Amino acid sequence: MSTSPGARDVTIPRDVEEARRAIHDVVAQQPFARLMGYKVVDAADLAVTLSLPLGLHLMQPHVVHGGAMYSLADAASTFAVLTRLWPEFWATTVEQSIQFLRPVTAQRGEIVAFAHVRRFGKTISFVEATVTFEGREVATARSTQMRQPRPR
C-alpha cells in the first residue's frame, strides 16, 4: 500500500515497459552501479537481469573476485524489488547469502545475474538470484530486501 494520498499503489504489478523504465532510472541515479559498470539486460515486474563486463580490475589473481559476483547478485536482487517500488520507495538488503559453484577465470566477457522476487511483502521481500558466465551457473544467492522510504 502507498503511504500518501494519490500515490501509486505498489502492490499492483507493473507492465514490462514500466518496470524497465524504473530500473534504467535507478541505475542512472546510483553512483555505485555506474562505477561497477552494471548494464540492464532486461527487466519485468519483480525480475531483473543485469550484466557486468569482465576486466583485470575484477580479477584476484586468476579468477573473478567473489565480491564482484556477490555485488552483482545483490544489485540485481534489490533492483528486482525496485521494479515494483520505484520511485515511491527504496529497498535495502537486510541479508544475503551466496553459494559460489565454480570459478570464473576469464578476463573478458561478462557475468550475468538474473534475480526474481519469490515473495513480495508489504515491508520484506524474498529474492533469489543466479549468476552465470557463458550460460553456466557460477553462483546462486538468496536475499531479504526491506522496503524503505526513498531518500530525498
Locate predicted features:
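A generic structural signal for short beta-strands and their flanking turns/coil linkers
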Residues: 34-36, 46-48, 90-96, 109-111, ...
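Short, glycine/charged-enriched secondary-structure capping and boundary segments
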Residues: 65, 113-114
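HotDog/MaoC-like acyl-thioester-processing domains
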Residues: 2-7, 11-14, 87, 105-110, ...
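Non-catalytic linker/capping segments at the edges of enzyme domains
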Residues: 1-51, 55-56
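Preference for bulky hydrophobic residues occupying beta-strand positions
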Residues: 50-52, 98, 129
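Hydrophobic beta-strand-centered segment that forms part of the acyl-chain substrate-binding groove
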Residues: 80-111, 117
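Hot-dog-fold acyl-thioester-processing enzymes
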Residues: 53-78
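Hydrophobic residues in beta-strands and at strand termini
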Residues: 52-54, 100, 147
